[in-house]
């Protein structure tokens, strides 16, 4: 009955965020701009999943505690966007090759038995790249 539809994030620079998520195989499907400039909403799609981005002119940056995943996980609330890939090592190399990351991310085995690594989007939001089940 219930299926995932979208995940919403607030961003500081829509164009930087679009560029980042395009490299993760998302494509823009909708781009709304309020006439008064009060908000811009962009939807990007990857498969059946939609990432919805909000940009408000007076938006604030993430709090400092979000700088490390270990500390962030201890705070209640949404934590990260997870994207699955067939080959985590290949994905890590690919992200370095296309310039999305400066260094090849360290891959962890994971307590739940699936290899993964984390990167951050332009606003510091964690994105987990995890092996397919």
Task: Locate the predicted segments by residue.
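Conserved active-site tyrosine of GNAT-family acetyltransferases
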Residues: 17-22, 95, 124
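Short hydrophobic/aromatic beta-strand micro-patches
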Residues: 8-10, 82-84
């Amino acid at each position: 009955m219930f299926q995932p539809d979208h995940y919403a994030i607030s961003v500081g620079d829509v164009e930087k965020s679009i560029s980042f998520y395009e490299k993760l195989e998302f494509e823009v499907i909708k781009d709304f701009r309020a006439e008064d400039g009060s908000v811009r909403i962009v939807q990007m799609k990857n498969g059946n999943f939609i990432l919805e981005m909000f940009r408000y002119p007076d938006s604030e940056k993430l709090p400092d505690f979000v700088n490390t995943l270990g500390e962030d996980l201890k705070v209640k609330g949404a934590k990260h966007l997870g994207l699955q890939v067939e080959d985590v090592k290949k994905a890590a190399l690919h992200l370095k090759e296309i310039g999305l990351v400066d260094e090849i991310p360290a891959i962890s085995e994971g307590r739940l038995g699936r290899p993964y690594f984390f990167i951050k989007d332009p606003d510091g939001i964690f994105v987990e790249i995890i092996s397919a089940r």
